[in-house]
Amino acid sequence: MEIFKLINQELQRQQDQIELIASENYVSEAVLRATGSVLTNKYAEGTPNKRYYGGCEYVDQIELIAIEKLKKLFGARHANVQPHSGSTANAAAYLALLQPHDKVLAMGLNDGGHLTHGSKVNFSGKIYDFYHYNVDPNTYLLDYDEILKKAIEVKPKLIVCGASNYSRAIDFAKFRQIADHVSAYLMADIAHIAGLIVAGYHQNPVEYCDIITSTTHKTLRGPRGGIILTNREDLIKKIDSAVFPGELGGPLMHVIAAKAIAFDEALQPKFKTYIKNVIDNSKAFCEAFINKGYQIIANGTDNHLFSINLFKKFNLTGDLVENWLYQANIVVNKNMIPYDSNKSMNPSGIRLGTAAMTSRGLVQSDFVQIADWIDQIIKAKGDLNVINKVKSEVKKLLVKYPIYQDRDY
């Protein structure tokens, strides 16, 4: 069938290309097995032991295992594993805490925030009244004093911290102080850094934030999905009711099973080693660009990602460089940078991440080599001879790091 042919072609693409998109990763064979299991046949509207359908005795056990493992990972009192994505987790969190047109303060999209943090084209910006804080225009770092001033001015009901493109550590304790000062709820969207948090390489928001949302892929290395956490007893029912029946009908039980497996994998000692390698690789990768004279947003990284300003020094846009690199089998994504004068489809930057290729086994020296390849292509302004030379070297490198060797669709 044509679909299976295309899946095999996608498998080959993943094998042959260097994946530097910060929101992508490679799941384990066990996670793949669960995602493609017979659990996809089962409708299980409701929550464990409170379903609206019969025949749920096994999926009840699966969901309860997922919940308990997730609570253990974060040290949280309560967890909901049903959201289909990070966006639906955020939507449910807002539904639990807010009324339409309530004020919310979140990170600006260009500064590193997410569409669901109040973009005017997103449901969040249409239903709620979002205001935004920005990074410092010189350092591109969060300025907590300025965020406090903005919070006092806006008087939001909810403050959202967390980002989709911020390379430095986030101080949840400081955000808690700001939220308390204006009597606001505090929500952390940790979609990108969840893996770092559970491995102990980033401050845990659970003790500081009223509600925490995340994806289960990215650095957590699970299936595509979302989660919600809280330590507040008075919010548990509101959160669960916001997910079902407020937002979702039937949960995806095959994905919840895959989440449970990924959570168990993240509880193992080798996951902490993996995350340390992700961060070490990211720092080495970033430093290689700094040594070549590139402008790195926030002048470095504390996590799995960083962004490069291509426009200031090279007068290049992210879409152009993304295309050049893709021709050489290097996959990145174009990205807006703080205070960007360009539009979203031809922004000034690219974003790079190390989580996926670290999963494949690449080490710091490999990332230094990749930085050199990217530098060659950028400085040659996409010359095809340079692109083809790099592409052949990329293929030689990746032969040493195969993925899903026994898979065939």
From Swiss-Prot:
- Protein's name according to its UniProt entry: Serine hydroxymethyltransferase
Q: Where is this site: Plays an important role in substrate specificity?
A: H217
One GO biological-process annotation of the entry reads:
tetrahydrofolate interconversion
- Matches recorded under InterPro entries: PyrdxlP-dep_Trfase (IPR015424), PyrdxlP-dep_Trfase_major (IPR015421), PyrdxlP-dep_Trfase_small (IPR015422), Ser_HO-MeTrfase (IPR001085), Ser_HO-MeTrfase-like (IPR049943), Ser_HO-MeTrfase_PLP_BS (IPR019798), SHMT-like_dom (IPR039429)
Organism this protein belongs to? Mycoplasmoides gallisepticum (strain R(low / passage 15 / clone 2)) (Mycoplasma gallisepticum)
GO CC, alphabetical: cytosol
Recorded GO molecular functions are:
glycine hydroxymethyltransferase activity; pyridoxal phosphate binding
Provide the protein's localization.
Answer: Cytoplasm
Q: So what EC number does this one have?
A: 2.1.2.1
Q: What is the similarity comment for this entry? A: Belongs to the SHMT family.
